[in-house]
Swiss-Prot record:
Pathway: Secondary metabolite biosynthesis. CDD domains: AKR_EcYajO-like. The active site is at Y83 (proton donor). This is Aldo-keto reductase NECHADRAFT_45914. Belongs to the aldo/keto reductase family. Keywords: NADP, Oxidoreductase. InterPro entries: AKR_Detox_Biosynth, NADP_OxRdtase_dom, NADP_OxRdtase_dom_sf. The keyword Cell division does not apply. Substrate binds at H174. Aldo-keto reductase; part of the gene cluster that mediates the biosynthesis of sansalvamide, a cyclic pentadepsipeptide that shows promising results as potential anti-cancer drug. The nonribosmal peptide synthetase NRPS30 produces sansalvamide by incorporating successively one phenylalanine, one leucine, one alpha-hydroxyisocaproic acid (HICA), one valine and one leucine before sansalvamide is released from by cyclization by the terminal C domain of NRPS30. It comes from the Eukaryota. It comes from Fusarium vanettenii (strain ATCC MYA-4622 / CBS 123669 / FGSC 9596 / NRRL 45880 / 77-13-4).
Amino acid sequence: MSKTSVDKLLRIPQSLRDSISRTRVDYRHLGNCGLRVSNPILGGLHIGNSRWLPWVLNEEDAMPILKAAYDRGINTWDTANVYSNGESEKVIAKALRKYNIPRSKVILMTKCYRVVCDSENFDPGSGVTMHHELADKSKDYVNQWGLSRAAIFNAVEASLERLGTHYIDIFQIHRFDPTVPIAETMSALNDLVKAGMVRYLGASSMWTYQFAAMQNLAHAKGWTKFVSMQNHYNLIYREEEREMIRYCNDTGVGLIPWAPLASGRLARRPSQQSVSIRASNSRNGSIYEADDSNTDKIVSRVEEIAVKRNWPMSHVALAWLNKRVTAPIIGFSTVQRIEEALAAVGKELSEDEERYLEELYAPRPIQGHS
């Protein structure tokens, strides 16, 4: 074969070159499984209906953000059935249709466990979602939440309809359900995979012994195991390092943490008050907004390193986190926030800088398991 022929065979197609030039992220295996997800992952909590929470983006504001994320390579989108009472999933489906995004080119992640209200009973904020003990007393909501076989199948069928798809890439349990036998939950989840409704399984915040028990049972029965853990982890909240992160690393489970910037706390100076609607509505016991000298000292060190490196503070926090996880889940309120997060890709801290950021950490009450 002539050199010219070899050159033609090796020549990169223009379409591939164009695609690579537009891709601003890297893709990482989700733990030990074969699926690759974008870093970062787009968080859908911010998308849906501002009636649910005032800082949530309505459809007309969310659509261009979803388009901008996809155009830049953020092809992994995380949501939950309960986000905006199902509206988050619906907006994502509309974006795929409006922008002609092929279903096979995005990774859709959603969750089950909490109550999704009937539309006529839709309450702002948490509403019924946080009152499971009362939901079980209602003819409308009994078997509509939790991790029973009935609740899981009800949830996945509803999510498939809202998302406008016949399969979910990663179906996650939002929390652990102590009222249901683990075998019932894991058997139902395995059946979803075998039926083709779900391709991978993931889990979210819970105690490590609970997660390990579910994984061990699935392994013993030959059922599908979880490939990801979506836990609460950032420079301010590191309780997950005690057990969950070690367990996941040892067993090949991918880590995709929520609140990587501590609701923006790690992206602004200690003296700087947030002007976001979300922060102004979250000062109700959150560890991020409470008066806490230890948190302020950690954030001050983030700022110090950011100034030295001429980086935004968010890049320092993300550089520290990206070394330890598969990909953080970030909620974007503007295209500018997407650009800022993507500019952090590939940035690394020195070992001395990492120690400097970590050494002030003090134990905190567990948050996010309920």
